[in-house]
């Protein structure tokens, strides 16, 4: 049965035209987002950001739904809103591509988060356009997360990852966690001097799928062999048992400074990550197919079980007939 799923996945991949990630489009999204200005959770600016994201998704033929909640932070209570857009596939099991669209709250300087908060949202918008035109064996979900950033100056305790924690808890409650098979998290990928290291918190096979794709694309100069430990929006998914990988460039000199502007990022970096993610996707789908039973199918017990069960039933009948 599993082999049949793998064959079906490969067949869909074979008839799908090559999907092209357009960094020019992604860059225009990034330019528009940065032009809004600082976009911290709960601000009027993040409302404008949500409208832009929803409008662009609609232009690509995708509808966005909102996950809204009140988050109690160490600083204040904030209304937060994550956006979800679904691209139906041949099966209901889904791969989630996620990234945050909020920027860190700073009052000392103007922080527009070109890479940190901007690049992930811009990337997901372009990825959505590409995957909408693709025949997807599994359902694809685009998740624009609010509340990744800490409200206090430092990342500490639960003052962070508000959106991802809320999403996972909601998925547990409504049962949709069962169909969530993998998370690919995109964060801070705009750096002109792009250096992405392996994350030791991420799921090894999923990490390998990304790094192997980078090597096949001759882009392994950007996806480095060394590793580091990263705390990010993938942690709640990992804690819930969802295979997850974080694609992030932490070696970014402009991180959490006023210099995180368009001057510090490049369309080339967006293109590199887009090419690698799209090259890795078929391999991720095939790997997941190997672990899944057919939709609606019952798992078959081994023949030996039926033979043993038949013997047991026969013995029970004989005992009953003998008056035992």
Name each model-derived stretch.
Residues 30, 34-41, 57-64, 87, ...:
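Sec/Tat-exported extracytoplasmic proteins
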Residues 108-209, 226-229, 234:
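Acidic/histidine-rich catalytic neighborhood of metal-dependent amide-processing enzymes
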Residues 6-17:
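Hydrophobic h-region of N-terminal signal peptides that target proteins for export
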Residues 33, 67-69, 87-89, 98-102, ...:
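Active-site-proximal beta-strand/loop segments in catalytic clefts of secreted hydrolases
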Residues 28-90:
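A non-catalytic alpha/beta surface segment that caps or lines the substrate-entry region
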Residues 45, 68-70, 182, 189-306, ...:
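Active-site-adjacent substrate-binding region
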Residues 60-62, 91-95, 136-141, 178-182, ...:
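Loop/turn elements at helix/coil->beta-strand transitions in domains of secreted/extracellular proteins
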Residues 16-20, 34-47, 71-74, 107-118, ...:
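Second-shell loop/turn segments in exported
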